[in-house]
Amino acid sequence: MLTLGLTACATDDASSGDAAAKGGDGKLEVFATTGYLGDAVKNIAPDADVHVMVGPGGDPHTYQATTQDLELIQQADLVVWTGLHMEAHMLDELASQGDRQIAVGDELPEENLLPWPETDDEGNPLHDPHIWNSTDNWKHVVGTISDKLGEIDPDHKDTYADNAKKYQDEIDDVADYVQDKINTIPEEQRYLVTGHDAFNYFGKQFGLTIKATDFVTSESEMTPQDIKELAKFIAEHKIPVIFQDNLQNPQAINSLKEAVTAEGWKVEVSDKALYADSLGAEAPTDSYIGIMKYNADTMAEALGK
């Protein structure tokens, strides 16, 4: 048993002493900052005990750790977080976990990353942290998590690798599904306007122009002049629908709708929210695969009219 004070649950295929990084009865304890990461871990290591920090509707950009979160981080065999300044209020706590932590976004090749319009506290340029909206990036993340789990629990390294490969194949399948859905939208209507700027990777991969009423972080909203310029863009391109997301910023969306009306164009707000930085509470939006399909279906239904 680790000296971390784990509170593990039983599993049938592992004994308490078969890996240095297991709880007393053999079950890995994993702390994941987002539902996307937790879902990836569960697909790779379905017997692991996974605690997800930011639940449905939560915002990892602004989330601040609770006392319970900090206790669970200390107890975990592995802490999985996005990095790339996503968990902006928890950087020190997460990075200080040494070999027990991995910031999966930091493991991506730089050429896979998109720019972010902000800098860190020292003025260094950052990258867009919404990496799950690129299926190639997410496959890389799955491989990174699998490798790290294999280091912690070498007796099951091959199982993790096999599960990761199966999950990566599912991600390829969902990429094909999403592309087919987006292809049903007429090319001149492939504009996605949302309340949170989480879909730039999605747009790059699947062929959509992305606009949003905030910048990459949900804490950074557009000025009235920015809203006016975006409204003019919507009117000029005759974009029929704008989207809220599950972070819910209705004031900005409603302000944008009014500004579009002032430009002489009528735009609707979709009655279905897109899923941005957190999973949903129930199927199908409680998984990465489910959300990718749901978002694509929602976009195609609204923009393909």
Identify the role of each PLM range.
Residues 5-305:
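Extracytoplasmic metal-acquisition and chelation regions
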